[in-house]
Amino acid sequence: MQINLLSIQKNNNDEFSKIDEHYTKLIKKFCSFNEICVFNNKINQAQNTNSIEAKKSYTNALNPYKKGFCIALDEKGKEFTSVEFAKLLQDKNEITFFIGGAYGFEQEFIAQMHTSIALSKMTLVHKFAKTMLLEQIYRAFCINTNHPYHK
């Protein structure tokens, strides 16, 4: 299985990065994992213009990476229990997760996904959402392989 994680963000080396690295190592025991952080001048300029331009810039930056079973993180997406999320990931050859920028995604981008998920009804800081997703991906593998991490 191949899992791709695309996010609109600058590469940072902070406390979240250390936790993300930990879960990435654990995930790689179960599958091939590729993470790409996308942030370019067009995104930076668009975010300083307005939300519509920002969302367009996210779509343009992420469109080339749509491969396999595509899942966008979106506040209006479906909420899953950990067990339901594990079932969603089963029997897929390639899964690509998309985490948008500060303004979320264009509706057209969401419509092109196989599904969209919400990690919570609350708004989460971008970095925390990514960390939470990584932990849930690892937990899903543990559930699907009866690993004792998930009890």
Curated annotation (Swiss-Prot):
It is an enzyme of class 2 (transferase). GO terms for cellular component: cytoplasm. The keyword Cell cycle does not apply. Gene3D superfamilies: 3.40.1280.10. Its EC number is 2.1.1.177. Keywords: Cytoplasm, Methyltransferase, rRNA processing, S-adenosyl-L-methionine, Transferase. S-adenosyl-L-methionine binds at L73, G100, L119, S120, K121, M122, T123, L124. SUPFAM superfamilies: alpha/beta knot (SSF75217). Belongs to the RNA methyltransferase RlmH family. Specifically methylates the pseudouridine at position 1915 (m3Psi1915) in 23S rRNA. This is Ribosomal RNA large subunit methyltransferase H.
